[in-house]
Swiss-Prot record:
Underlying gene: iscS
Domain of life: Bacteria
EC nos: 2.8.1.7
Cofactor(s) needed by this chain: pyridoxal 5'-phosphate
Annotated protein name in UniProt: Cysteine desulfurase IscS
Family statement: Belongs to the class-V pyridoxal-phosphate-dependent aminotransferase family. NifS/IscS subfamily.
Organism: Psychromonas ingrahamii (strain DSM 17664 / CCUG 51855 / 37)
Residue positions where N6-(pyridoxal phosphate)lysine is found in the record: 206
Enzyme class: transferase
SUPFAM superfamilies (UniProt xref): PLP-dependent transferases
Amino acid sequence: MKLPIYLDYSSTTPVDPRVAEKMMQYLTPGGEFGNPASRSHRFGWHAEEAVDVAREQIADLISGDPREIVFTSGATESNNLAIKGAAHFYVKKGKHIITAKTEHKAVLDTCRQLEREGYEVTYLDPKEDGIVTPQQLKEVLRPDTVLVSLMHVNNEIGVIQDIAGFGELCRANKTIFHVDASQSVGKIEIDTQALKVDLMSFSAHKIYGPKGIGALYVSRKPRVRLEAQMHGGGHERGMRSGTLPTHQIAAMGEAFRIAKEEMASDEVRILALRTRLLNGVNDMEEVYVNGSLENRIAGNINISFNYVEGESLVMALKDLAVSSGSACTSASLEPSYVLRAIGRDDELAHSSIRFSIGRFTTEEEIDYAINIIRKNIGRLRDMSPLWDMYKEGIDIKSIEWSH
């Protein structure tokens, strides 16, 4: 067993060796290194063929059409293209947008930018389990609602939203519906037709592919139009200019192909490991699972260990690569905005750790993690005056601290 143990699959995944091997075939002089837009020689033809195959593999996993796949640099760009592109193109319908407070920053900050441009954004509050209900959406949908953007699976707490329910409402209201599926694709079934989704964002590096490549599903039936955010050679049917990186695209296609084949078996194994981890720690005092345990992807468990500072906990668990907050925002010491949105107080939000398990996690690693967590939580609590006060029955919330 190699230390540290990687339990941060929600922030990124290692590239599957099969994917890396595929990627290498499109880089070197001996491989197919051509520009897919070069139509006058075999180097270009072969590269274009590889891109076409990858498009099919990606579409296959989400029950879409290959012509509905637009390649981008990742889910952040896909989210920007979807939200700004649709809001600008359909501005005549209205300037009202709906999203949720627990979305990824790539969605929230894009919506904030549109607010600066004069759009009105409604932010839905999730329930305590992290779920947003179709009823909540129904109550705020308006005739001038141009776009709804709601994630499929939350990156911090792993809860699964009712995308089909939202899709029905948006379709009936003639509102464009965008879904950030970077945390769900390859982990749970996605059928874009059944879900009535217009736009859907994906990233390769959350599904054992390389970083720097993603895609946006853009529905053809009903046809959705977007205003381009990147201008140049008119690649990707004018929606996203820039030379296509064949090696990254082929690798993303391979990652999606493997996911389609192995998703069911991966889920069973990963869920067993998560259950093992949770059973190993949940008999400890003041341990809280954040977000719904029922409506949740197999690989995510987010736990608050009360009376322990999250930052000191991460330091103490130095042999475990885990995250406190999401990777994109954990550089700041603010408590997680996702946990605050579901009603966790600052203390519990600060003491939260996200464990995310993946394809290469072993039982031995989980057992080691349980051992190290139990040992260190006890040690850190022994050093905490708050823990002593709690054990003495003092209500900490009733104390007024002098500044």
